[in-house]
Amino acid sequence: IGVSNFKPAHLEALAAETDTVPAVNQIQLTPAIPRHEQRAYNLTHGIVTESWSPIKGILDEPVIVDLAEKLGRTPAQIVLRWHIQRGRVAIPKSVTPARIAQNLDVFDFELDASAIAKIDALEIAGGAGRVGPHPAEVNG
C-alpha cells in the first residue's frame, strides 16, 4: 500500500496494528523542506519516499533562477533534476501539455556538485513552508 504524510509514529502504529509496512510514503519534500529524519526512517524501513509538490514555493529562489539561466533550463527542471540526483521520487502536478513535457525533459543534463550544494543550502529550518494539514492533526 501507499500512504501520504505519515510520520514515523504513524508508520509504527500502522505496522503494529496491521503488520503492514507501506511501499510508498508520499510527503511534501522540496529543497527548502528536505525532511531528513522522515526520509531516513523510510529508507531504513524499505519505504520509498515520494515527494508531492516537489517544486512548490522554490521556483523563484535566486539560486534556482540563476542555475536555470546558466544551464538553459526552466527553474522547475532544475529542481526536478535535483530530486533525481538526490535519489528521490518527485511527481509534479501539471495539466499543461507544454509544462508536462518540460517536466519530463530532465534526463539529458546533470547538476554539478556545486549546484547541488547551493540547492541543498535552501533548506528552511523547522520545515517552515509546509502546505496542507499536519498529519498529527488529522483525524486525531
Regions found by a protein language model. Name each.
Residues 2-140:
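Beta/alpha (TIM)-barrel catalytic core signal, keyed to glycine-rich beta->alpha loops juxtaposed to Asp/Glu
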